[in-house]
């Protein structure tokens, strides 16, 4: 114990050489001694090294412009949303890297809400972010969630999905990203107080509050409620980034109604009618989300809100052709593995985009349309080795016509015909 030594020998610190009389405390070990001053110095050295490691981690984290540049390679349009997400995730992981050694200022989590129509890219943006940052990612559907004790899925099961996707690496899971889709579907059924329990609406919002803010959650490793005796896994959600998304059908009118009230009066010009389909998003406030049915406590834990626009026909054509993993590139690659050159005419691409818009599916509907259009070709080509090329036209998409098939023998006969004509 400190300061309890015999007078048989002079006690000195094994590190700095100072005697017991020169320091406040001397701690004895197995044949060695260390003074309080060396303990303080050692702690400072360790803290400095941890700080250096954390700074290095922060430096390796892609900057917002770099994150957006990578998003641009996969996601068409939605520039405003991509900027907001890039800044939010950068600040989130920068906050984590600073927490270990600097607690002078508490930085709050940057949970994000994405509001946009079906097929505008909400889920895909979240997935791409996780891939860029190389962190575990999980998707949950808010419509399957219910308050604890009722039939349905507990909110803790969302964390189990993340843990599973992290291969049960708890540390990695605790720095992952969770995307909760269809969040608008758990809005309150009514603004009025009801005597009946809203277990899939307000009740779920209440259940999500703690994990959104940061808590130690008990997660059943086998999921669900079928194994009540199973030992729980403790997951700290403090550093998990939550992104929620939904279409919020009807919120546009809530915004316009609020703006309209401000212009009512004699001689007042009502500019609400001048707001186009997407411009209303600039006027969206948290109060509008509360009016929609999200409880204030829930919105308070999601400080960053961004909106996504409807994708135009031109945008969807770009989605089909430009990204690294564009659908047209994927199908061309698939058929090329069977020695077939797949081509889409400009008219076909435009027809695919228009059909996705007509069906109100956005980018989400593109794959289904292509798949249905070339299903027979994908069925035949592995067996019919003489197929050299396939051309998909507008009629194939709209009228379900057969794609134009070019066979190797047809090409040879065409070549012979040209040679014969030249001989004559």
Curated annotation (Swiss-Prot):
Keywords: ATP-binding, Chaperone, Metal-binding, Nucleotide-binding, Zinc. Residues 1-54 form the ClpX-type ZB domain. SUPFAM superfamilies: Glucocorticoid receptor-like (DNA-binding domain), P-loop containing nucleoside triphosphate hydrolases. Zn(2+) binds at residues 13, 16, 35, 38. It comes from the Bacteria. ATP-dependent specificity component of the Clp protease. It directs the protease to specific substrates. Can perform chaperone functions in the absence of ClpP. Component of the ClpX-ClpP complex. Forms a hexameric ring that, in the presence of ATP, binds to fourteen ClpP subunits assembled into a disk-like structure with a central cavity, resembling the structure of eukaryotic proteasomes. Belongs to the ClpX chaperone family. This is ATP-dependent Clp protease ATP-binding subunit ClpX.
């Amino acid at each position: 114990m400190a300061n309890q030594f015999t007078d048989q020998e002079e006690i000195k610190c094994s590190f700095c050489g100072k005697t017991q009389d020169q320091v406040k405390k001397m701690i004895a070990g197995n044949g060695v001694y260390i003074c309080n001053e060396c303990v303080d110095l050692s702690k400072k050295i360790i803290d400095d090294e941890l700080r250096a490691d954390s700074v290095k981690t922060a430096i390796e984290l892609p900057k917002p412009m770099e994150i957006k540049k990578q998003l641009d390679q996969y996601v068409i349009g939605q520039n405003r949303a991509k900027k907001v997400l890039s800044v939010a995730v950068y600040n989130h992981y920068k906050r984590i890297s600073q927490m270990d050694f600097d607690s002078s200022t508490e930085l709050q989590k940057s949970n994000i809400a994405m509001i946009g129509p079906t097929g505008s890219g909400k889920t895909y943006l979240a997935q791409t972010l996780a891939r860029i940052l190389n962190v575990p990612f999980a998707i949950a559907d808010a419509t399957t969630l219910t308050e604890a004790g009722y039939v349905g899925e507990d909110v803790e099961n969302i964390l189990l999905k993340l843990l599973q996707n992290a291969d049960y690496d708890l540390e990695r899971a605790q720095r992952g990203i969770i995307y909760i889709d269809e969040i608008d579907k758990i809005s309150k059924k009514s603004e009025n107080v009801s005597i009946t329990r809203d277990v899939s609406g307000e009740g779920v919002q209440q259940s999500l509050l703690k994990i959104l803010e940061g808590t130690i959650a008990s997660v059943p490793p086998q999921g669900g409620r079928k194994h009540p005796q199973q030992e729980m896994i403790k997951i700290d959600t403090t550093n998990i980034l939550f992104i929620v998304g939904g279409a919020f059908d009807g919120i546009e009118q809530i915004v316009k109604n609020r703006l309209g009230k401000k212009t009512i009066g004699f001689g007042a010009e009502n500019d609400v009618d001048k707001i186009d389909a997407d411009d209303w998003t600039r006027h969206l406030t948290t109060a509008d989300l509360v009016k929609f049915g999200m409880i204030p406590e829930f919105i308070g834990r999601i400080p960053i809100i961004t909106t996504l626009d409807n994708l135009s026909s031109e945008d969807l054509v770009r989605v089909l052709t430009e990204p690294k993993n564009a659908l047209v590139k994927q199908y061309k690659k698939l058929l090329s593995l069977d020695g077939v050159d797949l081509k889409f005419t400009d008219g076909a691409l435009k027809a695919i985009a228009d059909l996705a818009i007509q069906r109100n599916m956005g980018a989400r509907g593109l794959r289904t349309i292509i798949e249905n259009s070339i299903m027979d070709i994908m069925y035949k080509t592995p067996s019919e080795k003489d197929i050299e090329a396939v051309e998909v036209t507008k009629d194939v998409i709209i009228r379900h016509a057969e794609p134009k098939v070019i066979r190797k023998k047809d090409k040879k006969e065409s070549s012979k015909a040209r040679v014969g004509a030249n001989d004559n």
